Amino acid sequence: MRNHWITMLLVAAVCAVPAARAQDSFTPMPLDAGFGPLDFTPPAIPAAKIIADFTAQEAVYRDALHHYTYRRTARVDTIDDDTKKVSGEYYEVDDVIFDPSGARTEKVVYAPPSTLDNGGIMMSPTDFQDIEHNYQFVLTPENIGEYDVKYVGRQRIDQVDCYVFDVSPKMIEKHKRYFKGRIWVDTDELEIVVTNGWMVPDDTKPGHEDLHPPFMTWRQQIDGHYWFPVYSVGEGMLHFSPQDGAMAEDVHIREVVKYTDYKRFGTSTTILYDGQDITKNGPQPGGQQPGAPQPKK
């Protein structure tokens, strides 16, 4: 987010939000009561083997997602902490579809004029990049070389048993952004089911400041096979420092993105899952799913 009225040197901080469990440097968004206690016992399988297996499965998931259409509904609000009401809003509904040639594209379904300038900010290109891509973070053999991945332990989310990993970029290349945070990987399906962290770095160059809140993304199984994103939420207090005589300003921001109506697009490409051809419609979701929270009003 960029400040709409003044340019300032900025520092990011997480908004104080009630949490059932404590936060740390790798879980900037609070965890609800669905997250059980962490088991720090070393895994029976070497962590390197788990990482290799789940990143390979993430590549399969990423490729499968490219064969689905879905609807994305994004809402970005500024919150007046005195009244607890929304002071500005960006809202857009898009269908992620395929054009007649089979190329992936997006169609705007509904996009009223943004009122975020009422709250003192405006959307930046990296905000759109987060909504369209980064909140659906995947860790595959292609990009894992950019990250340090540390095994933390095992944890149950609702009824789903998960491996827990902390992820951070090894180095920051200019003009690139990276995920830093924690991921939960289903111990059976070996796919990421929850992501909690930031996209880093923020731009702190005077005159180009661009802040973003931490975020959390939940996935659920679609047609019994893949854990696709269904809900992302980001929330934080953006602290803008004074400059050129202007007063300091804090902006409370909340972002909610929903992903719905997944449908497999007709394709001649064979999609393999666990060595089996599942290109045709597979079974409906079964088993346990971690529950995403309901959006705040």
Task: Tell what function each PLM region has.
Residues 23-180, 187-194, 198-213, 221-224, ...:
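Structured extracytoplasmic
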Residues 1-4:
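Positively charged n-region of N-terminal signal peptides that target proteins for export
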Residues 7-16:
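Bacterial N-terminal signal peptides
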Residues 18-22:
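Sec/Tat signal peptide C-region and signal peptidase I cleavage site
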